[in-house]
């Protein structure tokens, strides 16, 4: 993974995006924060994707360094860290939605819930409002 100072600045928005969050594990972490309510290291580790501990730790650190997520100590258990999307991270929700919709359309074995696909396609603003973390501003 590229640290923020190593992101290629060739002016291409796609290159910037891919260098900022474009690998498989980073996108799945963002998905899980947005749609599955994950917030702890254990949530991601036990999420069913099979991510290894070293890759998970690396991606969480990378996403934090790039301003996509933040981490804070859990007030109920100071040894546990709570991860949350920043405004910059939440702004990736439409990207995740579009990947989700594209896959739901073209993957013959999709397990995407039909209700969620329909809401992403037809009522995106309502879905964004529903999943927006309480601490983030409104747009």
Please state what every model-predicted region is.
Residues 35-39, 62, 89-90:
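Short, charged/polar surface micro-motifs in flexible loops or helix N-caps
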Residues 12-52:
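N-terminal helix-turn-helix DNA-binding core of bacterial DNA-binding proteins
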Residues 7, 39-40, 77:
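A conserved beta-turn-beta hairpin within the catalytic core of GNAT-like acetyltransferases
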Residues 22, 75-98:
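Basic, amphipathic "hinge/linker" alpha-helix immediately C-terminal to the N-terminal HTH DNA-binding motif
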Residues 1-9:
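A detector for short, charged/polar N-terminal pre-domain segments
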Residues 94-139:
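C-terminal regulatory/oligomerization modules of transcriptional regulators
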Residues 44-78:
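Canonical helix-turn-helix DNA-binding module
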